[in-house]
């Protein structure tokens, strides 16, 4: 793949084979962000699990302490008082049967989906539309719940969802390049703690095999998964 001059210069500014402390990797990623837009800071983790086995599927959510820097558009499938509660909590789109039909027809102008338990019998038919996009509501991630107001507030406040893919990789964001180094580091630490907590009992050997952090258009910097998770304390000179 042909890389831009900016990308090549950024890739040459650090040792691609070195395993950096999380905060050091974040600093490099921020420095490599030269685009005119506010790039997202992404993390990819390669896990020592077999996603083909149900008991090794790693999936969860975490509330990032400093949010994501993005305003998520939240859709809620609910009726009556639950629908009103969702609207009051800031849901962007709320509805029942008609909204289900609209989504089934291909409308996908939203970033997250929440549903009340009584709606799931009907929402279930959207599996082929929402599932491949990681948008299908699920009790395990708190998106199938009677407390739709809390679910909406959590998502709007910076809650992210992650799920291991068929190659055993986890992808998630920890904020924007405009965030301070410590903000990004603390978001990273929160996500890492949750991934570690979700380690399957049947997973043998090394659980986290590789971690990289990068901006949207920047090169990946390898992070040492064994370094301290209290990343904000790694460098007293870090920018908050």
Curated annotation (Swiss-Prot):
GO terms for cellular component: large ribosomal subunit. GO terms for molecular function: rRNA binding; structural constituent of ribosome; tRNA binding. The keyword tRNA-binding applies. Keywords: Repressor, Ribonucleoprotein, Ribosomal protein, RNA-binding, rRNA-binding, Translation regulation, tRNA-binding. It comes from the Bacteria. SUPFAM superfamilies: Ribosomal protein L1 (SSF56808). GO terms for biological process: regulation of translation; translation. Gene3D superfamilies: 3.30.190.20, 3.40.50.790. The keyword Repressor applies. Part of the 50S ribosomal subunit. Belongs to the universal ribosomal protein uL1 family. NCBIfam families: rplA_bact (TIGR01169). HAMAP family: Ribosomal_uL1_B. Binds directly to 23S rRNA. The L1 stalk is quite mobile in the ribosome, and is involved in E site tRNA release. Protein L1 is also a translational repressor protein, it controls the translation of the L11 operon by binding to its mRNA. This is Large ribosomal subunit protein uL1. It comes from Nocardioides sp. (strain ATCC BAA-499 / JS614). The gene is rplA.
């Amino acid at each position: 793949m042909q890389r831009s001059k900016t990308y090549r210069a950024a890739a040459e500014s650090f040792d691609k084979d070195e395993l950096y402390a999380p905060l050091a990797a974040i600093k490099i990623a921020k420095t490599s962000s030269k685009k005119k837009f506010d790039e997202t800071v992404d993390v990819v983790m390669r896990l020592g699990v077999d996603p083909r086995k149900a008991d090794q599927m790693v999936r969860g959510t975490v509330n990032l302490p400093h949010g994501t820097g993005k305003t998520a558009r939240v859709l809620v499938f609910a009726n009556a008082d639950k629908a009103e509660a969702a609207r009051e909590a800031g849901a962007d789109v709320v509805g029942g049967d008609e909204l289900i039909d609209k989504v089934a027809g291909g409308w996908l102008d939203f970033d997250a989906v929440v549903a009340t338990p009584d709606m799931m019998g009907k929402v279930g038919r959207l599996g082929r539309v929402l599932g491949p996009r990681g948008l299908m509501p699920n009790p395990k991630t708190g998106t199938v719940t009677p407390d739709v107001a809390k679910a909406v507030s959590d998502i709007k406040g910076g809650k992210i969802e992650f799920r291991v893919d068929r190659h055993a990789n986890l992808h998630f964001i920890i904020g924007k390049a405009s965030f301070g180094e410590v903000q990004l580091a603390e978001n990273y630490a929160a996500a890492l703690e949750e991934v570690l907590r979700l380690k399957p009992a049947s997973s043998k050997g090394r659980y986290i095999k590789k971690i990289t952090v990068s901006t949207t258009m920047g090169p990946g910097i390898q992070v040492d998964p064994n370094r301290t998770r209290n990343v904000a304390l790694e460098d007293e000179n870090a920018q908050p």
